[in-house]
């Protein structure tokens, strides 16, 4: 009898994606983050679904409905903190996944990479709207500040902001539509992730050496299924420890105060995973310039394949580029730290220097260094 997984139309797709998929024999644990992001997305959709059963998207009751979830719903506190900290785990995996792509030259798969950049924007939009929903002080003021940035767009800016708000300020209409979008976007992300995988499987995975692995493939199952399960268990361990021991470690205390339009918090700042972009935004004194820099800080990833000047794909055999890559990582950590600091000396100048270094490394220094490495190897 013919094996059902190779003949059944639905099973065939699963089989060719997760069972009989030919995978390079030398991919390291850095290749685990794709599956971990899938696990994170499933956790977020499931916990979000149960939260939505008890949440009300009305300015009068949103804050108290979240309180009700934590106090009165069976294991509501657990679901709420799994969802909040699950977002942090999601972004940790995302940043490591993108970093892996930059280091090993995975961006040379253009379609896969560009859909990945689109996914990054979609996840950031979803996280931003989700942060508004508890309707605490930082939710309200974060929404006000970030949506207000669109007013920097010439001619249509102020109309666009009012259109998004559904009025003349962040209010009930804004909260309701943010809840609607926050609910639907994860399913759009899941669909995009499917397309991301589709394009990846057209070419096959990259590997640490950046060389073709066609001559040395192994089946995905059992080798990489067991490896991915180990990764998922470690992710679950970290998330569980975070949720059960210090669930508010990554949150903002201001969000435990109900939203008050008449009282501005002393330091308005987004969640930790947006701080690097927020620091770049704040480092430019001009409003439109800041908004453009903010968008470009992420959009620059789409131009990385065009800036690849090396004859080698991966950084595995390129020590100079490796050094610059880790300087870039340190720079991003510096920007994240600066984003959480008040706008005063010396943080302003540190933020400006870190922002200049960020764009200089990606646009100028790394491509030139790659050319130097080519010459050193007489290529």
Curated annotation (Swiss-Prot):
UniProt entry tagged with the keyword Membrane: yes
InterPro entries hit by this protein: Cyt_b/b6_C (IPR005798), Cyt_b/b6_C_sf (IPR036150), Cyt_b/b6_N (IPR005797), Cytb/b6-like_sf (IPR027387), Cytochrome_b (IPR030689), Cytochrome_b_C_euk/bac (IPR048260), Cytochrome_b_N_euk/bac (IPR048259), Di-haem_cyt_TM (IPR016174)
Note on cofactor: Binds 2 heme b groups non-covalently.
Amino acids binding heme b b562: 83, 182
GO (cellular component) term, any one: respiratory chain complex III
Cofactor(s) listed in the protein's UniProt record: heme b
Effect caused by changing residue 232 to V: In strain: Isolate LAF1511
Keywords carried by this UniProt record: Electron transport, Heme, Iron, Membrane, Metal-binding, Mitochondrion, Mitochondrion inner membrane, Respiratory chain, Transmembrane, Transmembrane helix, Transport, Ubiquinone
Function: Component of the ubiquinol-cytochrome c reductase complex (complex III or cytochrome b-c1 complex) that is part of the mitochondrial respiratory chain. The b-c1 complex mediates electron transfer from ubiquinol to cytochrome c. Contributes to the generation of a proton gradient across the mitochondrial membrane that is then used for ATP synthesis.
Entry protein name: Cytochrome b
């Amino acid at each position: 009898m013919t094996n059902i997984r190779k003949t059944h139309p639905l099973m065939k797709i699963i089989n060719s994606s997760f069972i009989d998929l030919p995978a390079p024999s030398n991919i390291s644990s850095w290749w685990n983050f794709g599956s971990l992001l899938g696990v994170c997305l499933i956790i977020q959709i499931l916990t979000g679904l149960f939260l939505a059963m008890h949440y009300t998207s009305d300015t009068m009751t949103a804050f108290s409905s979240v309180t009700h979830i934590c106090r009165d719903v069976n294991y509501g506190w657990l679901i709420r903190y799994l969802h909040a900290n699950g977002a942090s785990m999601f972004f940790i995996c995302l940043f490591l996944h993108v970093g892996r792509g930059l280091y090993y030259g995975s961006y040379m798969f253009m379609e896969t990479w560009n859909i990945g950049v689109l996914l990054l924007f979609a996840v950031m939009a979803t996280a931003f709207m989700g942060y508004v929903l508890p309707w605490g002080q930082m939710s309200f003021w974060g929404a006000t500040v970030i949506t207000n940035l669109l007013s920097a767009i010439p001619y249509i800016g102020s109309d666009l902001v009012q259109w998004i708000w559904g009025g003349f300020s962040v209010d009930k209409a804004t909260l309701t539509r943010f809840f609607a979008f926050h609910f639907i976007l994860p399913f759009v992300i899941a669909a995009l992730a499917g397309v991301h995988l589709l394009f990846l499987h057209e070419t096959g995975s990259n590997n640490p050496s950046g060389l073709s692995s066609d001559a040395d493939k192994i089946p995905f199952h059992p080798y990489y299924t067991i490896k991915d399960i180990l990764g998922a268990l470690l992710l679950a361990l970290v998330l569980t420890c975070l949720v059960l021991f210090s669930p508010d470690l990554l949150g903002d205390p201001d969000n435990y105060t109900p939203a008050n339009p008449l009282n501005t918090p002393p330091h308005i700042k987004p969640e930790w995973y947006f701080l690097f972009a927020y620091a770049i935004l704040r480092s430019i004194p001009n409003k439109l310039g800041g908004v453009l820099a903010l968008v470009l800080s992420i959009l620059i990833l789409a131009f990385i394949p065009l800036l690849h000047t090396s004859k080698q794909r991966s950084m595995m055999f390129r020590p100079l580029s490796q050094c610059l890559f880790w300087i870039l990582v340190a720079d991003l950590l510096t920007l994240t730290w600066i984003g959480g600091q008040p706008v005063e000396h010396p943080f302003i100048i540190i933020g400006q220097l870190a922002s200049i270094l960020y764009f200089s490394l990606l646009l100028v220094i790394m491509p030139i260094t790659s050319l130097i490495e080519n010459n050193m190897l007489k290529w």
